[in-house]
Amino acid sequence: MASEPNLRYPTEETGDRGPQGPPGPPGPQGPPGPQGPPGPQGPPGPQGPPGPQGPPGPQGPPGPPGPPGPSGLPGLFVTNLLLGIIILLLLIIVAILLVSKLVVN
């Protein structure tokens, strides 16, 4: 049956084809596409602020002992010598004052 010619519109009786109809309305929007690949890595951020100051370090070991001091006898001798000279000068001044007082009288 499908091989029989269409008898309702024989080719001899059909007229010229009419003008083309207007275009149909646009179809519905398609589904969204797949997600794209991730973008490239951004540049490194700025340097952060300096951290807090650390705790003080442990106390260092004690230093080596100092050299021995000078002997005490020469220092004592110099001190006694200076005191003796000062006392001697004071006695000479007192003697001069006493002699001058006696001479004036």
UniProtKB/Swiss-Prot annotation:
One Pfam family matching this protein: Collagen
Gene Ontology terms for molecular function: extracellular matrix structural constituent conferring tensile strength
Compartment list: Host membrane
Region entry Disordered, spans: 1-75
Chain ranges on the Extracellular side, renumbered to this chain: 97-105
Compositional bias segments (type: Pro residues): 20-71
Positions of the Collagen-like domain: 15-74
Swiss-Prot/TrEMBL keywords: Collagen, Host membrane, Host-virus interaction, Membrane, Oncogene, Repeat, Transmembrane, Transmembrane helix
Membrane-traversing stretches: 76-96
GO terms under cellular component: extracellular space; host cell membrane; membrane
Protein topology in the membrane: Single-pass membrane protein
Segments in the Cytoplasmic topological domain: 1-75
GO terms for biological process, alphabetical: extracellular matrix organization
More details: Saimiriine herpesvirus 2 transforms T-lymphocytes, including human, to continuous growth in vitro. Two viral proteins, Tip and StpC, are essential for this function. The virus induced transforming activation is used as an important tool of T-cell biology, including HIV replication.
Assembly and binders: Binds to host RAS and TRAF2.
Function: Acts synergistically with Tip to stimulate NF-kappa-B activity and interleukin-2 gene expression by binding to host TRAF proteins. Activation of NF-kappa-B protects lymphocytes from apoptosis, thereby facilitating viral induced cell transformation.
PANTHER family: COL_CUTICLE_N DOMAIN-CONTAINING PROTEIN-RELATED, COLLAGEN ALPHA
Official protein name in the record: Saimiri transformation-associated protein
Organism: Saimiriine herpesvirus 2 (strain 484-77) (SaHV-2)
